[in-house]
Amino acid sequence: MAGHSKWANTKHRKAAQDAKRGKIFTKIIRELVTAARLGGGDVGSNPRLRAAVDKALANNMTRDTLNRAIARGVGGGDDAQMETIIYEGYGPGGTAVMVECLSDNRNRTVSEVRHAFTKTGGNLGTDGSVSYLFTKRGVISFAPGLSEDTIMDAALEAGADDVITYDDGAIDVYTTPEAFGEVKDALEAAGLTPEASEVALVPSTRTDLDAETAPKLLRLIDMLEDSDDVQEVYHNGEISDEVAATL
């Protein structure tokens, strides 16, 4: 959608769909448990856990619930067998797609992911087939109406990598994964509340989708997100305002 932050729009759509399915808490709890198990329970020294906590709070999870999930991760238990698996492939229109999963059964997960790609005209790729098009970055998105100079000054002083302003006034701040929490804290301390924020795989290039291929990509995303094992779906598909109006 030209002229404004594609990142926030894509993530908001996903959040709304996940919430509608009642899956988002299950997925966030899995991520909290795994992040705490792998990196410890201190959000100050565990960027992955910090990102998961931010996502939990943004989706109105109670502190009690998220603290219990962190405690489960630190203490081990049944969740200790969960592993992070990343699949990559080509979606409709040649779009590059990355699928982040948390699973205790690789065979089940890859079967579900492959089925989604096949049903929508894409194909599951090999390791490295599209991952070179993505970089893990912190993304902090602001809605139109805030001062570009204020956000830029606060973000760059706190260690952000880049600040992008869109035609409609929306602003995205990009950071390294390690600096994500510090930059977000600095922005919030300056009275700047983000519309969305997370550590994510950000594409370096975009693939334009027409009115025929765009619905197929959206169907692929829906099918992937229907899997309890799938945590995040990232892609480089570009849907123009004109095409979006036909969907």
From Swiss-Prot:
Signal peptide: none
One GO molecular-function entry: DNA binding
Pfam families per the UniProt record, alphabetical: TACO1_YebC_N, Transcrip_reg
Compartments, as annotated in UniProt: Cytoplasm
Organism superkingdom: Bacteria
InterPro entries from the UniProt entry: Integrase-like_N (IPR017856), TACO1_YebC-like_2nd/3rd_dom (IPR048300), TACO1_YebC_N (IPR049083), Transcrip_reg_TACO1-like (IPR002876), Transcrip_reg_TACO1-like_dom3 (IPR026564), YebC-like (IPR029072)
Keywords for the protein's UniProt record, in alphabetical order: Cytoplasm, DNA-binding, Transcription, Transcription regulation
Biological processes, Gene Ontology terms: regulation of DNA-templated transcription
UniProt-listed Gene3D superfamilies: 1.10.10.200, 3.30.70.980
GO CC entries: cytosol
HAMAP family assigned to the protein according to its UniProt record, in alphabetical order: Transcrip_reg_TACO1
Family membership noted in the UniProt record: Belongs to the TACO1 family.
Protein name per UniProt: Probable transcriptional regulatory protein SG1259
Organism field: Sodalis glossinidius (strain morsitans)
Source species taxonomy: Bacteria, Pseudomonadati, Pseudomonadota, Gammaproteobacteria, Enterobacterales
